[in-house]
Regions:
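Catalytic cores of Mg2+-dependent Asp-rich isoprenoid enzymes
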Residues: 1-7, 13, 17-135
Length: 135
């Protein structure tokens, strides 16, 4: 369940600006209030230091779910593990971009380059081939 929560939090952060523009907010309002912010203030980035701190705190929460879900990898069938690994690498990569530039959560859409995604896919495909044909 932790990996799913981590993926969902990453999606929420990736789409935050777009969602706020459409009057949707999937983060708890109590977390905004705890930092004396509103979703509108974060969207406008009106308090840059607090907004960045808020986004980083959400990133830390997502990262904690990724970390706590690490034991999941040992429970997954070897032929399914490369897919989970690839998804996790892509989502963690998006999260890392937001962590490095918190305003990206409202300024644009964090994404990995096509080259990075191709590299991840090739590594997953290689791992799948090894899992399907163990020596």
């Amino acid at each position: 369940m932790g990996r799913g929560i981590a993926f969902q939090l990453t999606n929420i952060l990736r789409d935050l600006g777009e969602d706020l523009d459409s009057d949707r907010c999937y983060l708890p309002l109590a977390e905004f209030r705890a930092m004396e912010l509103t979703p509108e203030m974060v969207r406008a980035w009106s308090e840059p230091d607090r907004c960045a701190e808020f986004i980083r705190a959400q990133c830390e929460r997502a990262r904690a779910h990724y970390d706590r879900s690490a034991p999941l990898d040992a429970m997954i069938d070897a032929t399914c593990l490369p897919t989970l690994w690839a998804m996790t690498e892509i989502y963690k990569g998006v999260l890392a971009k937001i962590e490095a530039d918190p305003q990206l959560a409202v300024r644009g859409r964090a994404r990995l380059s096509t080259l990075r995604k191709v590299w991840i896919a090739l590594r997953a495909k290689h791992a799948l081939a090894k899992a399907e044909n163990p020596k």
